C-alpha cells in the first residue's frame, strides 16, 4: 500500500495528466529542461518541488492560494532566494489549458483572471496514505501514516510498516526499498525470537 498524491480537481487536470500535469517533480523534472512550469501548493512538498524544478526549468511559478506559505522558514528562504522561482500568492489555478499538451493555466489572483503560459503543471498539495485496513491494528499520525521506527516496528506486536505509508520525511522509491529491507530483517529477527 502506498499514498496517492492528492489531486486538486482543477479543470483540465485529469485530461492533461501525463501530458503536462505531474504529481512527482523528482520523477518528471528533467522532462521540463529549459521550459516554464507551475507548481500549485504552499507546503513543504510544493516548495521542495519548486526548488528541484528550478534546477531544470527556465522559470517556475509557485502558486499558492494564501498570502503566506506553510512550509518551513528555511525552505521558504531558499525558494525566495532562487532567481527563476516566482511566488504568486493569493492566487489559484482555475483551469489548465492546452490541446494535446499543457500550454497555459488560467490564474485567478486577487480577483483578477489572467493566462500564464507554461509547459507543465506540478500538483503538490500533499498525499493520502491508503492505511484504512490497518487503522484498528496500528497507531497512525493525524494524516493516516503508520507510526513506525527505522526498523519498521509499529505499535502492534509483529506488524512492520515500510515505504510511503509510514511516517518519514522523504517518500521516494529508494527510501521505500530501504524500508522494505529493514522490515524483512526486523520480521526475521522477530520470528526467530518467537521460536
Regions found by a protein language model. Name each.
Residues 20, 35-36, 59:
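Residues that mark the start of a beta-strand
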Residues 50-51:
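Generic hydrophobic/aromatic pocket-lining and core-packing "Φ" positions
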Residues 41-43:
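Glycine-rich Rossmann-fold phosphate-binding loop(s) that bind the pyrophosphate
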Amino acid at each position: 500500500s502506498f499514498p496517492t498524491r492528492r489531486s486538486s480537481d482543477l479543470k483540465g487536470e485529469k485530461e492533461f495528466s501525463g501530458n503536462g500535469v505531474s504529481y512527482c517533480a523528482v520523477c518528471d523534472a528533467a522532462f521540463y529542461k529549459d521550459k516554464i512550469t507551475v507548481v500549485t501548493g504552499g507546503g513543504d512538498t510544493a516548495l521542495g518541488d519548486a526548488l528541484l524544478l528550478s534546477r531544470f526549468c527556465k522559470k517556475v511559478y509557485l502558486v499558492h492560494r494564501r498570502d503566506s506559505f506553510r512550509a518551513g522558514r528555511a525552505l521558504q528562504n531558499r525558494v525566495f532566494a532562487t532567481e527563476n522561482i516566482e511566488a504568486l500568492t493569493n492566487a489559484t489555478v482555475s483551469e489548465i489549458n492546452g490541446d494535446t499538451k499543457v500550454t497555459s493555466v488560467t490564474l485567478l489572483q486577487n480577483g483578477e483572471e489572467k493566462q500564464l503560459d507554461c509547459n507543465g503543471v506540478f500538483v503538490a498539495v500533499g498525499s493520502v496514505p491508503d492505511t484504512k485496513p490497518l487503522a484498528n491494528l496500528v497507531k497512525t499520525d493525524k494524516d493516516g501514516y503508520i507510526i513506525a521506527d527505522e526498523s519498521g516496528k509499529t505499535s502492534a506486536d509483529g506488524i512492520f510498516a515500510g515505504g510511503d505509508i509510514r511516517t518519514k520525511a522523504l517518500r521516494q522509491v529508494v527510501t521505500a526499498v530501504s524500508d522494505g529491507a529493514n522490515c524483512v530483517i526486523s520480521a526475521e529477527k522477530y520470528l526467530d525470537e518467537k521460536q
